[in-house]
From Swiss-Prot:
Organism: Mus musculus
Function: Forms paracellular channels: polymerizes in tight junction strands with cation- and water-selective channels through the strands, conveying epithelial permeability in a process known as paracellular tight junction permeability. In intestinal epithelium, allows for sodium and water fluxes from the peritoneal side to the lumen of the intestine to regulate nutrient absorption and intestinal morphogenesis.
Modified residues (Phosphoserine): 111, 211, 214, 217
PANTHER family, A to Z: CLAUDIN (PTHR12002)
Record PTM: Palmitoylated when heterogeneously expressed in S.frugiperda cells.
Residues marked Important for Na(+)-selective paracellular ion transport (site): 55, 64
Ranges facing Extracellular side: 25-74, 141-159
Domain of life: Eukaryota
Gene that specifies this protein: Cldn15
Name of the protein in its database record: Claudin-15
Organism classification: Eukaryota, Metazoa, Chordata, Craniata, Vertebrata
GO cellular component, as recorded: bicellular tight junction; lateral plasma membrane; tight junction
Length: 227
């Protein structure tokens, strides 16, 4: 049962990592909204790297942010957290692939595989946590500006990339928990194989006849029985 759980957790973490990569490259982290009586013909959408505008004809024009130092602090922080999440996810995916009991890499015993699974599960949990913090931090800034009556700039709504990122982070965390929870079970299996108990062959003991028994058996026959 634990083999199925750790395999399921491994693929769940891999799916979460893939979705985190798609979230980072998605253009729709936030989308401009029509707020109040102002009528606009352009739709603006942004992510962590660039901003785009779509006119009434459906033509989109994108431009990169001018300077990293000119960006808001939360955008730079979200960039760092998302990149960290993907790097941790890749490292956890590699260690988990080696530590799975259905794989045979380097003829490792179960105790070493259990340690690798524990590290891989921890990395996936940290990756999901980094992604969750980055997405939530970005969403909080969107909602803060949206409900601020003194904010005179363009107001945005949550883009579909944020919902994808939340789902990806949750999958990474759940997959990491599944992988981490099976490391104790895998280290306890096959104790006799890991202990290397010595083999003692069985011996057969043949009882020897005593002197009294030999005298009794000799007395059963008379002297005339021997030639």
């Amino acid at each position: 049962m634990s083999v199925a759980v750790e395999t399921f957790g491994f693929f769940m973490s891999a799916l979460g990592l893939l979705m985190l990569g798609l979230t980072l490259s998605n253009s729709y982290w936030r989308v401009s909204t029509v707020h109040g009586n102002v009528i606009t013909t352009n739709t603006i959408f942004e992510n962590l790297w660039y901003s785009c505008a779509t006119d009434s004809l459906g033509v989109s024009n994108c431009w990169d942010f001018p300077s990293m130092l000119a960006l808001s602090g939360y955008v730079q922080g979200c960039r760092a957290l998302m990149i960290t999440a993907i790097l941790l996810g890749f490292l956890g995916l590699f260690l988990g692939m080696v530590g799975l009991r259905c794989t045979n890499v380097g003829n490792m015993d179960l105790s070493k595989k259990a340690k690798l699974l524990a590290i891989a599960g921890t990395l996936h949990i940290l990756a999901g946590a980094c992604g969750m913090v980055a997405i939530s931090w970005y969403a909080v800034n969107i909602t803060t500006d949206f409900f601020n009556p003194l904010y005179a700039g363009t107001k945005y709504e949550l883009g579909p990339a944020l919902y994808l990122g939340w789902s990806a982070s949750l999958l990474s965390i759940l997959g990491g928990i599944c992988v981490f929870s099976t490391c104790c079970c895998s280290s306890k299996e096959e104790p006799a194989t890991r202990a290397g108990l010595p083999y003692k062959p069985s011996t057969v003991v043949i009882p020897r006849a005593t002197s009294d028994e030999s005298d009794i058996s000799f007395g059963k026959y008379g002297k005339n029985a021997y030639v």
